[in-house]
Swiss-Prot record:
It comes from the Eukaryota. The gene is mcfA. GO terms for cellular component: mitochondrial inner membrane. Solcar repeats lie at residues 43-132, 140-224, 233-323. It comes from Dictyostelium discoideum. It is found in: Mitochondrion inner membrane. Residues 1-36 are annotated as: Disordered. This is Mitochondrial substrate carrier family protein A.
Length: 327
C-alpha cells in the first residue's frame, strides 16, 4: 500500500511538472509570436502607403505637361520632326496647336495609374526598410539610409514597370485616341510579354540610385536644417527640402533616364535586330553617334518637372502623414 501511494504521488508530480513545462512553452510561443507581430507592425505603416499614394497622384498631375515635353525631347531622334520639341516654350506651343490643351496631359491617366502606386510602394517600403536598418534609438547611418532608399526604389519600379512602358507608348507613339487597352494589346501583339519589361534593367539602374540619393539628400537637409537653423520649420519647408534634393539627384542621374527611354521606345520587327542591344550598348552608341550632350537631352524641362514634382511629392506626403497621425 505504501509503495502504491508513493507511485501515485510520483505520477502526480510528473504530471504537474509536464503541465508547468507546457504552460512555459505556450507562454514562450505566445511571447515570441507577439514580439514578431509587434515588430512586423512597427516596420510597416499603412499611413506611409496612403500618404505616398496621394502625393504621387497630385504631384504627377500638376507636372504632367512638363513630363510629356521631357519625354518627347529625350526621344526626338526616334520621332519624325522630333526636333520641334527641343525647346520648352516652342514645344508647349506646338503641342497646343496640334493637339489642343488636352495634348499637354496626353497619357496622364496611365501616368497617374503608374505614379500613384509607385509613390505609395516607394514610401511604404522605404519606411519599412529604414526602420529595419535603424538603431534602437531611431538613429540611422547615411549608408543604411541610402540602402533603404535604393531598396524601396527597386521594389517600386519592379512592380510598376509595365505601367511605365504603357505610359511611355501612349505619350509618344500612340495616336491621340489610343486607349490603355489598345496600347497594351499592341505591345503584347508586337513584342510579346517581354515588351512590358523592356528597359527594366535601365529602370532599376535609374530609380535605385535616384531613390537612394533623393531620400538621403532630403532627410539629411531636413535633419541639419532643424538641428542648426530652424528647430520648428514652417509647413512649406518639405517643399524646399524636396526641391533641393530633387535638383541634386537629377543632375547626377539624368543620363540613365535618357538611355532607359531610348531602349523602351525602339521598335523592330521580329526579323530585325533592335537599335540597342542592352544598357551599355545604348550608352556607347548614343555617345558615339550623338555626343555626350545627347545623354542630357531634355534636362531643362526635366528640371522644371522633377524639381516641382519632388517638392510637391514630399510636401503632400508630409502633410498627409501629419493628418493621418492626428486621427
Amino acid at each position: 500500500m505504501v509503495i502504491n501511494n508513493q507511485n501515485n504521488n510520483n505520477q502526480n508530480n510528473n504530471q504537474n511538472n509536464n503541465n508547468k513545462n507546457d504552460n512555459l512553452n505556450n507562454s514562450t510561443t505566445t511571447t515570441t509570436t507577439t514580439a514578431t507581430t509587434t515588430k512586423s507592425s512597427t516596420l510597416f505603416h499603412s499611413n506611409d502607403f496612403f500618404s505616398g499614394l496621394i502625393a504621387g497622384i497630385v504631384s504627377r498631375t500638376l507636372t504632367a505637361p512638363l513630363e510629356r515635353i521631357k519625354i518627347l525631347n529625350q526621344v526626338e531622334v526616334i520621332l519624325k520632326d522630333g526636333t520641334k520639341y527641343n525647346r520648352i516654350i516652342p514645344a508647349f506651343k506646338v503641342i497646343i496647336k496640334e493637339e489642343g490643351i488636352a495634348g499637354l496631359f496626353r497619357g496622364n491617366f496611365v501616368n497617374i495609374i503608374k505614379a500613384g502606386p509607385q509613390s505609395a510602394i516607394r514610401f511604404y517600403s522605404y519606411g519599412a526598410f529604414k526602420r529595419m536598418a535603424s538603431e534602437p534609438d531611431g538613429s540611422i547611418s547615411v549608408i543604411n539610409r541610402m540602402w533603404a532608399g535604393a531598396s524601396s526604389g527597386v521594389v517600386s519600379v519592379a512592380l510598376t514597370h509595365p505601367l511605365d512602358v504603357i505610359k511611355t507608348h501612349i505619350t509618344v507613339i500612340a495616336p491621340t485616341a489610343a486607349t490603355i487597352k489598345n496600347v497594351t494589346k499592341g505591345i503584347y501583339r508586337d513584342l510579346g510579354i517581354i515588351g512590358f519589361f523592356r528597359g527594366l534593367s535601365a529602370g532599376i539602374l535609374n530609380i535605385a540610385p535616384f531613390a537612394a540619393l533623393n531620400f538621403t539628400f532630403y532627410e539629411t537637409i531636413k535633419e541639419k536644417t532643424q538641428q542648426y537653423i530652424l528647430k520648428s520649420p514652417p509647413l512649406y519647408a518639405p517643399s524646399i527640402y524636396g526641391a533641393i534634393s530633387g535638383g541634386l539627384t537629377m543632375t547626377i542621374l539624368y543620363p540613365l533616364d535618357v538611355v532607359k527611354r531610348r531602349i523602351m521606345l525602339q521598335h523592330f520587327d521580329r526579323n530585325q535586330l533592335p537599335i540597342y542591344k542592352n544598357f551599355i550598348d545604348a550608352i556607347i552608341k548614343i555617345t558615339k553617334t550623338e555626343g555626350i550632350s545627347a545623354l542630357y537631352k531634355g534636362i531643362r524641362p526635366a528640371y522644371l518637372k522633377v524639381i516641382p514634382t519632388v517638392s510637391i511629392n514630399f510636401l503632400i506626403y508630409e502633410g498627409a502623414i501629419t493628418l493621418f497621425e492626428k486621427k
